[in-house]
Each structure stands twice: as structure tokens, then as C-alpha cells.
Amino acid sequence: VHAMNKKNGYMKLEGKSIILNMGCRERTRGAIAIPGDRPAGVFTAGAAQRYVNIEGYMVGKKVLILGSGDIGLIMARRMSLEGAKVVGCVELCPYSNGLNRNIVQCLNDYDIPLYLSHTITDIQGDKRVEKVIVSKVDEKNQPIPGTEMEFDVDTVLLSVGLIPENELTRSAGITMDPATSGPVVYENMETSAEGIFASGNVVHVHDLVDFVTAESQKAGKSAAEYVKNGETKDQTCIDIKNGDGVNGIVPQKVRPSNVDKKVEVMFRARNVFTDVAIKVRSNGEELASFKREHMAPGEMEKIVIPKAFLDKVENGEI
């Protein structure tokens, strides 16, 4: 591994195992191509969070938030508590991409309106943001003429998604999953490269740091076992595929011989669903079913598959 830091400068390190924990970065204005002027006053929600919470700077007095990700929702509340006027939260999708509790605690409790199926179509201003135009969008996410709304604000916060930092992962030739924008991992968080493990937001974007911590502990334990015992001898593998209505499954591969009692599978719904069942099938046979009263893309789901069910898989795929 080639690395560098302030204390030691450039270094070359050798190890029997590597854990990738690079996290993710925020999607910026340039990444989503918002039209309009380029004045000061447009921040990612995470950058604004740092300015307010750590640096002690107020980023604006009248704020509009684009996107309903959790960081944006939390910053809506934070800006309100700091004395700013948050005029609204604008979301392109017909549903929120944040946790429901954040919608309630950060928007509803502060009377901040949420505009679903809307987006910013113009930002106006000379040196500083002065006005933002918001339009309703159709089913193809295209602005609908005649639905424009004007907001006189001096600040725009962007909460429009996170991108896993996988430049190192790709350069190592590790197999990637387009659905998660992260590496394909086994049940023990090992990637397609022997001895290289990954966890946290570099694998897939999590809702809570609690999930990141648990996943990272699993990766750390697995890396230590690899150093001690070497690669798993039985490489017989089951592929876990996305079915109708679900996306971003992790782990994507499971080696039953490496599973003790159960395997936890995490994923997101493709849309908002109520009173549904998550079914695990192999070769047309239903192995397990899990009921859910509500599922939404903004909330990660988890099911637990017992090892006994994995032993019933015949075609190497569920």
C-alpha cells in the first residue's frame, strides 16, 4: 500500500489483509447540472453542516434546500435553530429520500414545507444568490411549464445524494456493483480480491452510523481471521440477485460454508410500498417470506436468512 500523512510523509506499507473504509462524498451542483447563475451561497448540506457546527459560521439567513436526504433534513432543523428562515425543501422524487423520523422532527415540527416532485430550474444572483425558481416535474422528471414558483433566498443547500469513494477500489481491479456504486462483497465483507475487505459507505450508503459500525466490526473480524487462517477453503458460492421492487443488495455473494448460523442481507426498495412481503426464492421455490407494513427507498431494509435455508439452494442463486 502506498500512503502518506503529515507526520511520516510518503510511505510504503505491507500487510496480509486490507480493509477499504473510504466512505463517500456528496454530490455537488456540477454533478446534477442545475441551470442558472453561479453566485456564492450554494453549498452541499455537509459543507454547511461543517461551517455551522464546527467552524461556527452562519451560511445564510434565508434558505432553500434541494433534496430530502437525511443530512439536508437535519440541516433544515439546524438552520432554523440558528435563526435562519428555511422556506422549503424541494425533492425531485414523489417520495422523500430521508428517514421518516427526520421528516417529522426536522420539517413538520418546524413548519417547513416539503415540495415533492419539484426541482430547481434556475438560480439567479450576481455576487450572492438572490432568487431561486422551482418547478413541478412530470413522471419523466422533466419540468412542467407554467408551474414555476419563485423563492427570494440567499442560500441553497444541496442534499442530492452521496457517492461512495471507490477510486482505489476500481484501480485495484475489484468487481463493482452498479446498483450500489460499491464493490461486490461476500458474507464476510471480502471483495473479489482475496484478502481485501470493505465496509461502511464505501460499500453502500447507510442510513445510520450504527449500521456502519456493525458492518465495519464484521469486516475487521473477517480480515483478522483471514490473516490467521487464510482464504476460505470451500468457495462454493450463492449469488443474491435483485428481484422486483428491490435494489442494492449487500452482500451480493454468500459462501454457505463460511456462514455460522445466519446471514444478514440489506437492501433498499425501488419505490414506496405498503403491506408487502419480501420473498426469498431459489429455482422457483420460496425459501422464506418477510412481511413489511411499509418500505421506502429512503430507509434501508434488512432480512436475516438462516443457514438452513441456504443449504436448500440448488442452482447457486437466490
What are the language-model segments listed below?
Residues A40, G46-S96:
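Rossmann-like NAD(P)H-binding beta-loop-alpha module
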Residues S199-D244:
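A conserved FAD-binding loop/helix module that cradles the flavin
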Residues L20, V42-V52, T155-H206:
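FAD-site-proximal beta/loop scaffold in flavoenzymes
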Residues E231-F273:
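Surface beta-strand/loop "capping" patches
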Residues V1-R25, L64, I71, D122-V129, ...:
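Feature captures the FAD/FMN-dependent oxidoreductase FAD-binding
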Residues V1-K62, E139-G146, L157, V184-V185:
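FAD-binding core/adjacent interface of flavoenzyme oxidoreductases
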Residues C24-E26, G69-I71, I163, V203:
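Residue-level detector of alpha-helix initiation sites
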Residues S80-E167, K261-E293:
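A Rossmann-like FAD-binding core segment of flavoenzymes
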